């Protein structure tokens, strides 16, 4: 793949099947930065990041998708990746117990569930809840597509390392809607795609990956879309949250530490507000610009 994270869409000339191919190495590394997640959680976040990028590429409108694992009575209470149609991603996990390096999805989230939230820039928000019936995120999302869209869909997700740095990538195959389906053809293409090696996905150009997989097929590869990490936090958003709190609560926080430190779990930024800042906010003025990285 490219030196930068990119998503490629492709189409088979002789089959009613479309595909996507994505590499998110740099974005994955930024999701993990400033966090000390157990290896199994790192791997899970990588899988969710790839899946969210592939799902977001299916949007036909401006908006975003959130893929959220909600843990039950389990050591992993939450894992969430958010992405939009511009392929801007962010994610975070919350761990409250011991997680071994080889923990399975079920062991990490217990009787939890997967929530897919689609939020158009204009229009109604849609939310689907998916039971964790598969052993992997990919299998759970394949079930989601069959339940919600009745479209046969396969996801192929790989995580690992390149030059000792976290790497992740994946592919999606999906039958085109309103097309006559040939299950044997789709299964054949899925079998070919399943042979993709992690190293190939992490390091090779998209056209070479597709040639290795489908050299007997006629495939159209479209212009790529860049994928990046982007957090939506800001000092102004923090200020907007502070002004909704009761005055007594804000005063108590200031008396405890001398200032209020608001920390973004996604990117690690800190936003400090002192008594002068709070007074300014209460008077209806904008937040000043102090930010700590």
From Swiss-Prot:
Its main location: cytoplasm. Disulfide bonds join 231-233, 264-267. It comes from the Bacteria. GO terms for molecular function: protein folding chaperone; unfolded protein binding. The keyword Cell cycle does not apply. One of its GO terms (cellular component) is cytoplasm. It is found in: Cytoplasm. GO terms for biological process: protein refolding. The keyword ATP-binding does not apply. Belongs to the HSP33 family. Redox regulated molecular chaperone. Protects both thermally unfolding and oxidatively damaged proteins from irreversible aggregation. Plays an important role in the bacterial defense system toward oxidative stress. This is 33 kDa chaperonin.
């Amino acid at each position: 793949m490219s030196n930068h994270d990119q998503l490629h869409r492709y189409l088979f000339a002789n089959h009613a099947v479309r595909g996507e191919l994505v590499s998110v190495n740099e974005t994955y590394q930024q999701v993990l930065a400033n966090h000390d997640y157990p290896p199994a959680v790192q791997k899970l976040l990588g899988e969710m990041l790839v899946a969210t990028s592939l799902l977001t590429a299916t949007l036909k409108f401006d908006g975003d998708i959130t893929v959220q694992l909600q843990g039950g009575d389990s050591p992993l209470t939450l894992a969430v990746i958010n992405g939009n149609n511009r392929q801007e991603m962010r994610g975070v996990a919350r761990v409250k117990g011991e997680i071994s390096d080889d923990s399975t999805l079920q062991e990490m989230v217990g009787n939890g569930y997967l929530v897919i939230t689609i939020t158009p820039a204009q229009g109604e928000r849609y939310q689907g809840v998916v039971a964790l019936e598969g052993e992997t995120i990919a299998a759970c999302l394949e079930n989601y597509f069959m339940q919600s869209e009745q479209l046969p869909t396969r996801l192929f997700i790989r995580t690992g390392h390149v030059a000792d740095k976290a790497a992740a990538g994946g592919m999606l195959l999906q039958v085109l809607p309103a097309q006559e389906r040939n299950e044997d053809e789709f299964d054949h293409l899925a079998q070919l795609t399943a042979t993709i090696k992690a190293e190939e996905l992490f390091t090779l150009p998209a056209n070479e990956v597709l040639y290795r997989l489908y050299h007997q097929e006629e495939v159209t590869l479209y212009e790529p879309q860049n994928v990046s990490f982007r957090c939506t936090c800001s000092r102004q958003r923090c200020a907007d949250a502070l002004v909704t709190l009761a005055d007594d609560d804000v005063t108590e926080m200031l008396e405890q530490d001398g200032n209020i430190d608001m920390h973004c779990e996604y990117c690690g930024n800190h936003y400090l507000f002192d008594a002068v800042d709070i007074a300014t906010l209460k008077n209806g003025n904008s937040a000043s610009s102090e930010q700590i990285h």
